[in-house]
Amino acid sequence: MHIDRVVYLPITEDTVRLANLKSGGLDLIERALATDIKDIRSDPKLRLATALGIGYWGLDVNVGNGERVKNPLGSSAKVRQALDAAIDREALNQVVFNGEFFPGNQWVSPENSYYQQAFPVPKRDLAKAKALLKEGGVTAPFDVDFMVPKGAEPQAVAEVIQAMAAEVGINMKIRVTEFATSLKQAEAGEYEAYLLAWSGRSDPDGNLYSFHKCKAPLNYPGSCNPEIDKLLDQSRIPSDTGQRKAIYEKLTKLILDNEAILYLYHPRVLIAHTTRLEGYRQLSDGLVRVVGLTLK
């Protein structure tokens, strides 16, 4: 049966969405939880469509956006590098997402052709983290205001990061905030660290330029480096992939050294639907396309 009408129903609670799908109240839900994958796959009336997303989750650090930069994390790249070294990305993926997502440390995933292999996902190193804190002239412990969007998965991620960072004396004080409010506060510089996702773009420029260019609209950390700006502009000129990769390699080193954004992982797009719905195919951009779908 061809579909004549599509009804979109906003349901914010993850458990309610899945319950409605199971009961037949819905035919498809987007953004299923990774922890629900086993349950969905075991249900003969449900199907799971997945794709590795083109976006990422990362931790923004306020390094130049207002008065809230006056703290150890915002003032020193060494301290930000210490926080990075304290995070075990693979453990984070296993604990929160049952290993279903993709640990990362750049604005594109390790499966992307523009991923810089010279800068692989780092292993957790507590000794290095403590040494970097010392190099940064910081005496631990110290507190960090950690703004986190409301939601089961972001809050779980934040709690894991909090536990890991505490082992080197970085006390991440989680402040759960409604998503729309958190964006306004981030833009205004009313935070010290902010857990944030980006849906991603097919070209790496869409994951990079507006986040690291001086005074760019999505540069919530307020980072500004003339050398990074120059390379960002240069990266937009050539159409040759090899030339662009060479520029991105230089950019990657500068951006990872500065750590205004700590890239953490790349989510999978998880779409669950009933077996009544046929013809659904998921692409990496995360969009739900209804053309060609039928109900039996």
Task: Name every feature range the model reports, one short phrase each.
Residues 1-96, 112-258, 293-296:
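Extracytoplasmic/periplasmic ligand-capture domains
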Residues 98-118, 270-275:
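Mature extracytoplasmic/periplasmic domains
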Residues 264:
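Active-site-proximal polar cores
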Residues 267:
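Short, loop-centered acidic/histidine patches that primarily coordinate divalent metals
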Residues 271-296:
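Long beta-strand-rich cores associated with HINT superfamily self-processing modules
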